[in-house]
A protein has these predicted regions:
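Chalcogenol-based redox active-site neighborhoods
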Residues: 1-163
Length: 163
């Protein structure tokens, strides 16, 4: 399972969302910078904090032209309860096949119980990886302030086609 590096195209993942419509990443995010978050599960306090942080920063992220999507192996009911609890407005996927997602993205998988370890990607508007953050445990993850700063930097210092 190779890791995704800057410049690599993000693989196509079709995810079921609690909103009812499946989405295909990165196609559904094309044209904007995007953050793709794999979180361990609703039971993880660090994941809850990260998701809340991205929700709190939603206006700043939107103003910077950054979209967010998150997913985990949790079932629909657990995922919907998490989204409701934190009033998450970005798409949240559920029921991810940890082995398939790991094979496509290089994310680490906890063997028992099976779940994806925290992994985050920043994608450019063409669906290529700008930054990948892999964690083999509870800590080490993207934060919205860093993402906004990175995208602002890229827009200011890149060729017009990349902005």
């Amino acid at each position: 399972m190779p890791l995704l590096n800057p410049g690599d195209p993000f693989p196509q993942l079709v995810i079921s969302t609690i909103g009812g419509q499946p989405i295909t990443i990165p196609d559904a995010l094309a044209g904007d910078f995007a953050v793709v978050l794999f979180y361990r599960g609703a039971w993880c306090p660090y994941c809850n904090a990260q998701l809340r942080a991205f929700q709190r920063a939603s206006q700043e992220l939107a103003a910077a032209g950054i979209r967010v999507v998150a997913l985990s192996v949790d079932n629909r009911e657990t995922t919907a309860a998490l989204a409701d609890k934190h009033k998450l407005t970005f798409p949240i996927g559920y029921g991810a096949d940890a082995t398939a997602v790991a094979a496509a993205t290089g994310a680490f998988v906890n063997p028992d119980p099976v779940y994806l370890q925290s992994t985050g990607f920043v994608l450019d508007p063409t669906g290529k990886v700008v930054v990948s953050v892999y964690s083999s445990g509870a800590i080490g993850r993207l934060v919205p302030e860093d993402v906004v700063g990175l995208v602002r930097y890229l827009r200011e210092h890149s060729a017009p086609a990349a902005a």
